[in-house]
Amino acid sequence: MKVVLLVCLVWMMAMMELVSCECWSQADCSDGHCCAGSSFSKNCRPYGGDGEQCEPRNKYEAYSTGCPCEENLMCSVINRCQSA
């Protein structure tokens, strides 16, 4: 019984963490983050650092697999951040 309660508690904490990072648009995210994900599950994610996954910036600020790169980095053709 204690194990079941513990599992439920951990599950609830995980769900609360997921919901707290949820976003609908770029305005929902803090500086240094973008709103990225599928239509039903978008989360605020940090901009890509050197060698990390990225998506090129676009005028709609719509990103599905990753954020644009941090300043002074560019998103390469293989969707990895690299020095500009």
Swiss-Prot record:
Gene3D superfamilies assigned to the protein according to its UniProt record, in alphabetical order: Lipase, subunit A
Subcellular location: Secreted
Superkingdom, natural source: Eukaryota
Cysteines paired by S-S bonds: 23-35, 29-44, 34-67, 54-75, 69-81
Family: Belongs to the AVIT (prokineticin) family.
InterPro entries: Prokineticin_domain
Protein name: U8-theraphotoxin-Hhn1f
GO terms, molecular function: toxin activity
Disulfide bond recorded as keyword: yes
Range of residues in the leader sequence: 1-21
Keywords for the protein's UniProt record, in alphabetical order: Disulfide bond, Secreted, Signal, Toxin
Coiled-coil ranges (or none): none
Organism annotation: Cyriopagopus hainanus
GO cellular component: extracellular region
Tissue: Expressed by the venom gland.
